Amino acid sequence: MHNDKDLSTWQTFRRLWPTIAPFKAGLIVAGVALILNAASDTFMLSLLKPLLDDGFGKTDRSVLVWMPLVVIGLMILRGITSYVSSYCISWVSGKVVMTMRRRLFGHMMGMPVSFFDKQSTGTLLSRITYDSEQVASSSSGALITVVREGASIIGLFIMMFYYSWQLSIILIVLAPIVSIAIRVVSKRFRNISKNMQNTMGQVTTSAEQMLKGHKEVLIFGGQEVETKRFDKVSNRMRLQGMKMVSASSISDPIIQLIASLALAFVLYAASFPSVMDNLTAGTITVVFSSMIALMRPLKSLTNVNAQFQRGMAACQTLFTILDSEQEKDEGKRVIERATGDVEFRNVTFTYPGRDVPALRNINLKIPAGKTVALVGRSGSGKSTIASLITRFYDIDEGEILMDGHDLREYTLASLRNQVALVSQNVHLFNDTVANNIAYARTEQYSREQIEEAARMAYAIDFINKMDNGLDTVIGENGVLLSGGQRQRIAIARALLRDSPILILDEATSALDTESERAIQAALDELQKNRTSLVIAHRLSTIEKADEIVVVEDGVIVERGTHNDLLEHRGVYAQLHKMQFGQ
């Protein structure tokens, strides 16, 4: 199997073609229009011969009568074909960009959490926006150039051979040299283009970090640090761009030099008597004008290589993501509503790319309808245990059961439908409050159900104070809300979901004492008859748990009720003493 570095441009284009093929009708129309456009230019040059030999040569003055009409007709044809080709190419490009973005977006949504752990958000955004646009714009631009300029070159050569094959043959001899020059710079263009895609992702990441963390930047005086970081990646992008310009600029004069040498040689050959005898003023003008006219399409074809390589380099980057393995969803078991029994049996788990296990030999039973709390110092593995229940990661050893069946037996959709999650890092969408509470299921719930969930989460009071109540758009990630308000909307979302298994990962960490008391009452009600896994830093919130499990360095070191663990005077008792000073 070839990786992206081994794929040739042709192989990459062959992979891209199925994306383009459904819109080939637009390409065909554009191609015909481009050929007619090139033909009109070539035919315009051919008019020089009758104009000079007949019109101004006074052998046929009628040429001067019909010639202006032909010129006007050709210009009208040129304008129409230019519009049609541009419109069709833009239509195809837009369709290709949309298709590629949909494929990328859909594929990324199916990627495991470990994929996003390794990738920066800025880089992935750059792939969806910049790279997909680059594929279409570069490829379509290259197509326009190849078809139009290629047709021009063919037309000009045919006309030159028609009028003087002796002079034209000289240019044919030099054609392989042009091909070699293009081949030499081709590899350079591709390498630089790949570097530009990666550097653009770094620029996006740097800008995104500043924009998302602008408050921290201001508070901690990080303006200079962020400026230096952005300047560094921006300069790297500039240098890559200069390398591309340098390579492109070198290829241009090479082609122009070859064309100039050919033209000079043709001028010299035209002085031979055997050639001069067959040339008229009109013929020599057409031939030389055609040779000069060839320089523009030849130069464009040289540049098109760099343009096409940019598109293929971006395309390879996108295919690298599309070739990445998605989440394994091989389970066949579908369940409407689980009883809620969860059990860990000898579970060991290591995060991808790391050597040291995050969890070792975990054995844990969470009976249906019971509440188990996980406590421990930061980084001990509490949140990791919770993330394994939803199969955000797959375990190395052991098994995790739900209602007596291994989690891997269930379809991912069916499994995750059994779990409601409220974490300390709440993510809200740039949508209305109501749509955030009923996220992904807005048609399933009534307005009254959404309001009731908000009321149970003690969120209805601040929601009603908003300009449009539940219909208020809260901005990206709930930027218009306080931390506590975001947390309460997340709790309302979990309440509305009504799943049999509930995971509360520091769910009340962002709340003030008064709000915490109010929401804790709602959470206590929510946890009734549900299997609840509560991760808490504030030990006061989990004192009533059916069982408290203490995790340290990925290992369960203690378990029991609140009172039992205090009497044991172990790790839990130490944590309790640190918080309450008792």
Curated annotation (Swiss-Prot):
The chain crosses the membrane at residues 16-36, 63-83, 153-173, 253-273, 275-295. SMART domains: AAA. Homodimer. The gene is msbA. Residues 342-578 form the ABC transporter domain. Residues 28-310 form the ABC transmembrane type-1 domain. Involved in lipopolysaccharide (LPS) biosynthesis. Translocates lipid A-core from the inner to the outer leaflet of the inner membrane. Transmembrane domains (TMD) form a pore in the inner membrane and the ATP-binding domain (NBD) is responsible for energy generation. Keywords: ATP-binding, Cell inner membrane, Cell membrane, Lipid transport, Membrane, Nucleotide-binding, Translocase, Transmembrane, Transmembrane helix, Transport. It comes from Shigella sonnei (strain Ss046). InterPro entries: AAA+_ATPase, ABC1_TM_dom, ABC1_TM_sf, ABC_transporter-like_ATP-bd, ABC_transporter-like_CS, ABC_transpr_lipidA, P-loop_NTPase, Type_1_exporter. Belongs to the ABC transporter superfamily. Lipid exporter (TC 3.A.1.106) family. This is ATP-dependent lipid A-core flippase. Its main location: membrane. ATP binds at residues 376-383. It comes from the Bacteria. The keyword Transcription regulation does not apply.
